[in-house]
Amino acid sequence: VSKQSIHNFYINEQQSIYLLSHHDAKKHRQWLNICKKQLSLLGYQDVELIGSGAFGFVFAGVEESGAQWVFKFSRITLAQSVRDRLEDEAYMLSQINNPMVPEFFAFERVKKQGILMMARAKGEDLEQISLKQGRLKPRDLVNLALKLRNVLLDLRERKNGMSLQPVVHGDIKPSNIVWDQQSDAFSLVDWGSSVYAQIDVHGEPVASNIMDLMSSDIASTNARMGDVYFIGDEQMSGARSSPRFDEQGVASTIYALASAQSCRFGAQVIPAASLGLPIEFARVIDGMLSKDKVTRDAAGDYFIRNMPAMAKVYLPDISLPQAKPYIPFWTVQQTDLPDTVVYSSRKQFLRRADHNQQLLDVNDAQLDRYYKEFLFDTGDTEKAFLASISRLAKYPVVGGLSFHWQQESLFVESSLMLHDEGLQDAFTDAVNATVMLAQGIKQKGLFKCCLFDARQTIQLERDETGAYIFEQLPELNYSVSHVAASEVTRPHSYFEDGKDPDEQLQLPKKIIQCVFELNKIHHTGCIIFESLSDRLKIHYYYRLLDAEQEIAFSALLREIIQYTVSIQDYGVAGFMKLPYKNTREFELCTTQQVQYYPKNPKC
């Protein structure tokens, strides 16, 4: 396998600093410390990193008066044209005057480094709140929808002098909305995809003067790519920018928060109508997420026109029975939480190849992500399923999942250990969404994923010749917990799924032999070898379930590490073992059944 083909195996470096090479992690920490030091020298206190994305890093600091500010730094490794976008963002932010939008303060350029300074939005972003709470309550969603509707109205009615000059945010999603639950204030942040709209909601060109209408640019788009998990079809396909883009972002956001997902793609299988929302509100959201443009636009118009009336409906909290997880998981309370990363294999069968969509030149960070994360030739439900697996990895959880689609049924095997009992309800919502999305997939095949702690990842560096550099070999750690023999029916085998067509790394036979021996000992775990030209990464977790076998178990783990230094090939290969056969069977289901908020909640 050539070095170039390694890009087929995508374990996102952004997921954890622990997956960076020692050199890159050191550079990353140094750079963050330089930024913090610079801000401290300018007199700001309590400087902290509060976010990072494809284009830059975001820090917060407090000045002596107590005012809280945000500083957005562009990544200096990006092309100048991309770095210039931070200045564009600063300009667009300076044009907006709305209580839901943080106040612009200044833009500075220090050598190659652009820095945008603005007021800090109070509260926590809705993606984080969603991960902690699970599905948001109908009352909170309707309240949020009204606030977002008001912002959309303000943006589309914006004027430059006497002329209409609508603004498009272009990247509305849960992580770009900050909610201060004490004051119930929402803030719409991150204006990096914002542009002036080229066409209005009716598809007519917007022009502040006759020269704009005569311009040749009227046929080409000025739109910027927002988050590919939330933007609508028109923005994704490069249509001219329109206020309709933000209607799509709002619908995607409400839908994701209502369903405990991190994307818009699941609406065909888990429609808003199945999420316990008020009937009128649910139908509007489903309409806005429709595949038909006429339906979408009509629903968007209805949303803008009728949201104030919908928000007046009395929506008290109703006591619902606690949701039961469709597949079991264990919880333990630990102070040192895992930094979870997911590795998925056997994704190929989810793809629907479209050779007209071959990517030749990716120069957009979001598009790059779209292609790398297997989204460009999969159906919406498959995209939603893969996104739901990624969402599970946002929890402090280790374990494995195996989904097997057969003619009439879906079979799921699992071993999941959640390391924070306080997240049990939210994690249940995320797990159940994953299973429901899997029920909606029609292709027959097998999908496996491992969730491991990146803090435990072992990295062996290589020199220019490919030889490994180490003073002494590290050890594979494991935990021990005893499971009664009566609980074991037929242990899951490392080998029962056969060879994975997605994995190209040829492992030495001695490692395979060790894994074969390990397979005879009752345990759960996974080990993934990710072989790169400059280093070998070993991602793993192990839990021994038969304490009497500990001597043999630890000896085999030592042998595996000794034989890893004979890996010469490039690529990824891995093994996963679930603790015992506890297969759950589900019927395939193309759409979850309708469930609205009750007409009379007092009954």
In which residue ranges do the predicted regions lie?
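Juxta-kinase regulatory segment immediately upstream of eukaryotic protein kinase catalytic domains
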Residues: S2-S40
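ATP-binding glycine-rich loop module of kinase domains
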Residues: G61-R83
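AlphaC helix of the eukaryotic protein kinase fold
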Residues: L78-Q95
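Short beta-strand micro-motifs within the conserved protein kinase catalytic domain, predominantly
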Residues: E103-G114
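AlphaC helix of the protein kinase catalytic domain
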Residues: L126-L136
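Catalytic-loop of the protein kinase fold
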Residues: R156-D180
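Terminal C-lobe "cap" of eukaryotic-type protein kinase domains
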Residues: V294-T295, D301-D317
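Regulatory extensions appended to serine/threonine kinase catalytic cores
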Residues: L315-A438, K442-T457, E464, Y468
